[in-house]
Amino acid sequence: MRISRLILPALVLLLSAADEPQLVPDVSQREVEIQYSFTGADLLLFGAIVYPDGRRPDKPADIVVVLKGPEQSITMREKQKVAGIWVNADRARFRSAPSFYAMASSRPIAQIVDERTAAIYELGVDKLQLSPSSLNDSAELDRFQAGLVDLRQRNGLFVERPGTVEISDDVLYRARLPLSARVIVGDYTAETFLVQDGRVVAAAVRDIHVRKSGFEQFMAVAAERWSFLYGLTAIALAVGMGWAAGAVARRI
C-alpha cells in the first residue's frame, strides 16, 4: 500500500509533464573567441516547439529568449559637485549583477506575462535581481539600480528587443541577439521560455563559452601563471619604449 502511494503521485507528474509542450533550442555559436580585432558578435537563437501528439494550441504561444553573462559584484558611486569639484558622494554595492544581459521576445513582455512572472524569470532589465548589499532605503536602491541599468545599456551590455522573435507555423522560432565587444570571458547561458496564457509552460537552456584566443589568450595565461615575470616584462617594455621614444625625439 505504501509503495502504491509513492508511485501514484509520480505517475501523475509524468502524465502532466507529457501533456506540456517541450522546447528544442540551439544557438548559432557555442563558443565565441575574443581576439584583438573582436568587435562583437551576432548570435542566432533558434529552435522548435514540440507539442504533445502534435496538437497545436488554438491560441499562438509566445517565446522569450534571454542571454546572460557571468555575474559580477559591482560598486556604483554617485558623484556630486562640491565647490566646483566633482567628488564621490553616495555609493551602492550589488553582489550579483550580470555582466551582460540581452532579451528578445515575440511581443512586449507586458503583453505576455504579468509583473510577478516577469520578476520570477527576470524577463527584462527592470526585473533583474541585483542583490544589493549596502542599501536599506528603497528610493536610493531604485536610483542606483536605474543608474547601473542606464550605464550598461549605453555600453551595449544590457539589451532589450521586444517583438523581434519570429515564430513560424507556431512551431519554429528564431531571434538574433547582439554580443557586445565589451563582454568579459566566461560561461554564458541562452535561456528560452515558452509562454501560454501568461504562464511559462516550458524552458530550456544552452551554454555559450566566451574565451580569449591567440595573443590575448597567451597574455592572459602569462599574467595568471607567471605574474611576477609578467610584471617585470611589462616594466622592461615600458622603460624600453620610453627610452626609444626619447632617442628618436632627440634625433629629430
Predicted segments — roles?
Residues 49-52:
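Short solvent-exposed capping/turn motifs at the termini of beta-strands
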Residues 228-231, 238-252:
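Juxtamembrane interface at the cytosolic side of transmembrane helices
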Residues 182-212:
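Extended, hydrophilic extramembrane loops/domains of integral membrane proteins
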Residues 20-36:
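N-terminal edge beta-strand
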